[in-house]
A protein has these predicted regions:
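Short, low-to-moderate order helix/coil transition modules at the start of elongated helical scaffolds
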Residues: 1-202, 209-212
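Conserved beta-strand/loop scaffold segments within soluble protein domains that form the structured core
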Residues: 116-380, 394-397, 401-423
Length: 423
């Protein structure tokens, strides 16, 4: 595809970062680099990139910094949560800041072995970039029938640098949830400081037969950051996966969730909340393949867009030819908080089977004046009335969080991004 005017410069820099550790790179990383260079960067003329600005990123001078932080710095950014925590700083695992995993129910190994990793469901240029530049792979396994008592928390801390340079950090994780196992995994992304940086993330998850996954993503990076993520879920028969993403920070944040339902009677729930403010862009994308019959999926994606922010949603459900009795629903609800706020939404269905029940829908609206009037008549001021309505709009997603402490921390982050909140 035709690239951006400065596409070749960005590609050359990423190639240079790759070659700096070339001797350590796996053959699979080499292949992803070659695919990246062949593909090039997209432009706004490419349909899937029409609303995602890349110019502010690709004209940067990229560096890869191996920063060190103290336990106090980690704790200042951490969630208050009883968990097994693994800490990654600037793309690298830091054992000294992480919890021991022995006896936790999670088997963790960190290396550059990529031979057993699943192929990408929907590959694109930034997926290839992360696969090529990630320093290592975090291999996580939960054995058959195991149910770890605590959630696994993957904490990612990326620092920005002063001046024109942009620190780029890439994180690669893989989880194997064996037959009958149950686990909760939380991805937490934060910035060490207020300078801009570029985060790439890739997480692949195999959910075996009768296994149950709870996945939560918290993207809480700073307002100058760029964040491009690709999560793949593969479900076997009778498997269940619930994925909740709270995309609450970043100049440009693009999150892809691609899923294959590869066994009968599997159940999937994908929820997301995006809240772009000021001039931020948040682009949420889902790709779901119903490859076997008798599966059930529900998706609920909500955005609250303030100021001159832009939210993008693109979701597709594909029902294969023999996937009978499929039940798939996808909903995208959007709330505009400013006259210049924008939403672009494109839910899609591709159905190649008979005897299925599928639907999609999207709504775009503003706060109802009658609701405001009602609350004002009860003595509630304008700003508090707005915030009450917004919290109610988001509640369908936040209430899905089982841990009350975690829920309150997500609500606090939402509050920071509301009109009148501290940003």
């Amino acid at each position: 595809m035709a690239g951006l005017p400065n596409s070749s410069n960005a590609l050359q820099q990423w190639h240079h970062l790759f070659e700096a550790d070339g001797a350590k790179r796996s053959p699979q990383a080499q292949q992803h680099l070659q695919q990246l260079l062949r593909t090039g960067l997209p432009t706004r003329k490419h349909e899937n990139w029409k609303y995602t600005p890349l110019e502010g990123l690709t004209n940067s001078q990229f560096v890869s910094i191996a920063g060190e932080i103290s336990p106090q710095q980690r704790d200042a950014l951490a969630l208050t949560l009883d968990s097994v925590r693994l800490v990654f700083v600037d793309g690298r695992y830091v054992p000294a800041l992480s919890d021991a995993t022995e006896g936790s129910g999670y088997e963790v190994s960190i290396n550059d072995d990529r031979q057993g990793l699943p192929d990408a469901i929907q590959a694109e240029v930034f997926l290839h970039l992360t696969e090529s530049l990630a320093q290592s792979v975090t291999h996580i396994a939960v054995k058959r029938g195991q149910r770890p008592a605590k959630p696994l928390l993957l904490m990612h801390i990326t620092q920005g640098v002063a001046g024109e340079e942009v620190n780029t950090a890439h994180y690669r994780h893989h989880l194997d949830l064996a037959e009958g196992a149950e686990a909760t995994v939380i991805e937490h992304f934060v910035s060490l400081n207020d300078a801009r940086h570029f985060t790439g993330a890739r997480f692949t998850i195999n959910v075996a037969a009768n296994a149950h996954l709870q996945h939560i993503k918290l993207a809480f990076e700073n307002p100058l950051s760029h964040h491009f993520a690709h999560n793949d879920l593969l479900l076997a028969e009778d498997a269940t996966a619930f994925s909740h993403s709270f995309l609450l920070g970043g100049a440009v944040l693009r999150h892809n969730t691609s899923t294959q339902l590869n066994g009968e009677n599997s159940t999937l729930r994908i929820n997301s909340l995006a809240m772009p403010v000021k001039n931020e862009v948040c682009d949420t994308r889902t790709w779901l393949e119903h490859n076997k019959g008798f599966c059930n999926s529900r998706q609920l994606h909500k955005t609250i867009v303030s100021d001159k922010g832009r939210a993008v949603f693109n979701g597709l459900i594909n029902v294969a030819q023999h996937a009978i009795k499929t039940d798939g629903q996808m909903t995208n609800n959007n709330l505009l908080m400013g006259k210049l706020a924008e939403v672009d939404t494109k839910p899609q269905l591709e159905i190649y089977a008979d005897d299925v029940k599928c639907s999609h829908g999207a709504t775009v609206g503003r706060i109802d004046d009658e609701q405001i009037f009602y609350l004002r008549s009860r003595g509630i001021n304008q700003q508090d009335a707005q915030q009450m309505i917004i919290y109610a709009f988001a509640a369908e997603l936040t209430e899905a969080l089982r841990d009350e402490g975690l829920k309150q921390q997500v609500l606090a982050r939402i509050g920071q991004r509301l009109p009148g909140g501290v940003r």
